[in-house]
Amino acid sequence: MFEQEQWQPTANVETLFARAKIINNIRRFFTDRGVLEVETPILSEFGVTDVHLSTFSTEFVAPQAERSKTLWLNTSPEYHMKRLLAAGTGAIFQLCHVFRNEEAGSRHNPEFTMLEWYRPHFDMYRLINEVDDLLQQILDCEPAESMSYQFAFQEFVGVDPLSAERPILVELARKYNFMCDLDEDRDTLLQFLFSTVVEPKIGQERPVAVYHFPATQAALAQISSEDHRVAERFEFYYKGLELANGFHELTDHREQLHRFEQDNVQRAKLALPQREIDRRLLGALQAGVPNTSGVALGVDRLVMIALDKKRIEEVMAFAINNA
């Protein structure tokens, strides 16, 4: 009756054993360094305001409740982990499932495993070094190369991303078949050119850390005190994959509120639904999150590289098309 159902896992059993060993090694890396493992909710009362993230939601119907309550599946454990930092946990890490209502393909699955950790009193560069240590231990790779976003853009695109005028960026984007108008959002143009032109040319032989993204792409990172055009944000790339995204974390609750509000302004311009701002995160920031750097790393992609797999479903027990 059910013989034709595709019940088998998308990863073979040998791969699942290898994946488990890698995850155990990740845990050992942090416990050996005295970093506390934590667990936080997958469901949250607040979604994310970021215009580039699409989220899943569900309705919670409590007994005797007059109406249901919308809850959001987290795109990251970041907000809850920062509340723990404000409570005084010190350095923490987490391995968890996160959800993004976006594409599914060779590198993406709507549900995936994230490693996220926070290091109070680390600056961005010290955390970059720790990510490098982790990659060397898990992947047995060469030490990472580091370059600024500005340098990478100038080297491979041929223009300065911090000063190039919009018409120049539009012309370049069209050269690479991006259909856009002259009034296209500047960051959209930069992100397209970076992903299309720069990313394929870096991190092939060894991991590469790209740091100091434009201030307009700061997200939850601090703006550099040395150059207000850039944010204290970095990303790691290796073997054609974006592996990690890290920040010298913004801890000013007023600035964070302003950024959330600006996200909703941008959402209105793009005809996207408004998102309620996470007041609990702002309360934690106001109470006092220590000076901290944090990073999120895609575990499935890390396993892909470690085991030389080309598609993300090859390292997952069940991908979205077989869940």
From Swiss-Prot:
Report the GO terms under cellular component: cytosol
Record EC number: 6.3.2.-
- Record PROSITE patterns: AA_TRNA_LIGASE_II
Q: Which GO biological-process labels does this protein carry?
A: lysyl-tRNA aminoacylation
UniProt catalytic activity = D-beta-lysine + L-lysyl-[protein] + ATP = N(6)-((3R)-3,6-diaminohexanoyl)-L-lysyl-[protein] + AMP + diphosphate + H(+)
Keyword Ligase in annotation: yes
Task: Report any Pfam family annotated for this entry.
Answer: tRNA-synt_2
| Repressor as UniProt keyword | no
The residues that hold ATP are: 100-102, 109, 242-243, 298
Which key words tag this protein in UniProt?
Answer: ATP-binding, Ligase, Nucleotide-binding
The entry marks the following residues as binding substrate, namely: 76-78, 118, 249
* InterPro entries for this protein: Aa-tRNA-synt_II, aa-tRNA-synth_II, aa-tRNA-synth_II/BPL/LPL, EpmA, Lys-tRNA-synth_II_C
Listed GO molecular functions?
acid-ammonia (or amide) ligase activity; ATP binding; lysine-tRNA ligase activity; tRNA binding
NCBIfam families hit by this protein: genX, PRK09350.1
Q: How does it assemble?
A: Homodimer.
| Entry's family note | Belongs to the class-II aminoacyl-tRNA synthetase family. EpmA subfamily.
- Role of this protein: With EpmB is involved in the beta-lysylation step of the post-translational modification of translation elongation factor P (EF-P). Catalyzes the ATP-dependent activation of (R)-beta-lysine produced by EpmB, forming a lysyl-adenylate, from which the beta-lysyl moiety is then transferred to the epsilon-amino group of a conserved specific lysine residue in EF-P.
Please identify the protein, giving its name as recorded. Elongation factor P--(R)-beta-lysine ligase
Q: What is the lineage of its organism?
A: Bacteria, Pseudomonadati, Pseudomonadota, Gammaproteobacteria, Pasteurellales
The gene is epmA
